[in-house]
Amino acid sequence: MTEVEKYIAQFEPSIQEKLHALRATFYDVLPHTQESIRYKMPAFTVGKHHLYFAAYKKHIGFYPVYGLTEIEHEIAPFRAPKTKDSLHFKLDKPLPLELIRKIILSKSLQMQ
């Protein structure tokens, strides 16, 4: 079991399902990415940079998400209060996987 799999396994099944879907989306968009745990959360390597996600009591956080003006209107509803670079996906709502796919692709192009 990888460190990311161990991270996901600590949560209840409904949250695990969302985290597995998010992880799979990273690999769909970036099949050669490498995953690790950094800052106590799953991290996916993009060039010399990383994209992260983490589960919390009421949401899944996704970081860093800035500089994507072309899709900001889609991202805005998920912007975390008082931050410029993180998104919060509420646990009681479906994950917007198509939007997450766009974000990963856009950030990967930006981070190369």
Role assignments for model-derived ranges:
Residues 1-112:
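Charge-dense, helix-prone N-terminal extensions
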